[in-house]
Regions:
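Conserved PLP-anchoring active-site segment centered on the Schiff-base-forming lysine
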Residues: 91-108, 126-127
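Conserved N-terminal alpha-helix of the aminotransferase class I/II PLP-enzyme fold
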Residues: 35, 40-86, 90-91, 107-116
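Well-ordered alpha/beta subsegment
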Residues: 71-72, 83, 97, 131-135
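Short, surface-exposed connector motifs at secondary-structure boundaries
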Residues: 69-72, 93-98, 117, 140-145
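Active-site phosphate-binding strand-loop segment of PLP-dependent enzymes
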Residues: 128-147
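Short conserved active-site loop signatures built around small residues
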Residues: 2-35
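A glycine-rich helix N-cap at a beta->alpha junction
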Residues: 115, 119-130
């Protein structure tokens, strides 16, 4: 008796992390993709890669794996943490407010206080573990909560 597909279990996180999008290279025979250490790509290539910070074959593979794990339509990875901070914060507009945990990476604090403040985006830092902060949090009415 064959399995008719009604009892097939959906792959879990571990399986998806290892095997999602698994292919092998006809050219080299490698099963796992190599790490691409180049920073620039030939203009007009099939994949539209131009500079590694904006994407490369490894980014694309990671995005596909994460998208599969999260069962989502889209995923974006970044070349650095501060580029992720900038991308997320750039979705805000003047008058928006960011509520932040007080124990935050220093460069993120500087980005919020020195760069985005110029664009009318306010950041409030508070201890999320302190019950006394609840009123402050409610009164602030943040657009974005940064954990």
């Amino acid at each position: 008796m064959g399995n008719k597909g009604n009892n097939i279990k959906k792959p879990g996180v571990k399986t998806l992390s290892i095997h999602h999008g698994e292919t092998f290279s006809e050219e080299t025979g490698c099963v796992m993709p190599p790490i691409f250490s180049t920073s620039t790509f030939k203009h007009g290539n099939k994949q539209n890669f131009d500079y590694t910070r904006s994407g490369n074959p490894n980014f694309k593979i990671l995005e596909n794996i994460l998208r599969s794990i999260e069962d989502s339509k889209y995923c974006t990875v970044f070349g650095s943490g501060i580029s992720a901070v900038t991308a997320i914060t750039s979705t805000l507009k003047s008058g928006d407010k960011i509520l932040c945990e007080s124990n935050l990476y220093g460069c993120t604090v500087r980005m919020f206080d020195k760069v985005f403040k110029k664009f009318g985006i306010e950041a409030l830092y508070t201890d999320f573990t302190d019950k006394k902060s609840i009123k402050k949090i409610k009164d602030f009415q943040p657009t974005l909560i940064w954990l």
